[in-house]
UniProtKB/Swiss-Prot annotation:
Name of the protein in question: Large ribosomal subunit protein bL28
Keywords: Ribonucleoprotein, Ribosomal protein
Similarity field: Belongs to the bacterial ribosomal protein bL28 family.
Any Pfam family matching the protein: Ribosomal_L28
HAMAP family xref list: Ribosomal_bL28
Domain of life: Bacteria
Region of interest (Disordered), ranges: 1-21
GO molecular function terms noted in the UniProt entry: structural constituent of ribosome
GO biological process: translation
Organism the protein comes from: Jannaschia sp. (strain CCS1)
Length: 96
């Protein structure tokens, strides 16, 4: 299972642990990922995602999965999330 957020593309970063004596040792900063189930109001379905907690807060802030996907950039989304976004866009067009 990869350590990359499916909605924002946030992944591991590298850096240093720095001691009091200023000794540096390499380390990895991993994203805080959670397995969550998000529901789409337009599609009336639920989807399981592995997303960062920051992305979960953003989804809540934007008003749900449908609103988040409408504003999300295609290059940040995973292939599965991109397919879901296209389904949501089709449903919005059919509803309008």
């Amino acid at each position: 299972m990869s350590r990359v957020c499916e909605l924002t593309g946030k992944g591991p970063m590298t850096g240093n642990n720095v001691s009091h004596a200023n000794n540096k040792t390499k380390r990895r900063f991993l994203p805080n990922l959670s397995d969550v189930t998000l529901g789409s109001d337009l599609l009336d379905r639920r989807f399981k995602f592995r997303i960062s907690n920051a992305a979960l807060r953003t989804v809540d802030h934007r008003g749900g999965l449908d609103a988040f996907m409408a504003k999300a950039k295609d290059d940040e989304l995973s292939t599965r999330a991109l397919k879901i976004k296209k389904e949501i866009v089709k449903a919005q067009a059919a509803q309008a």
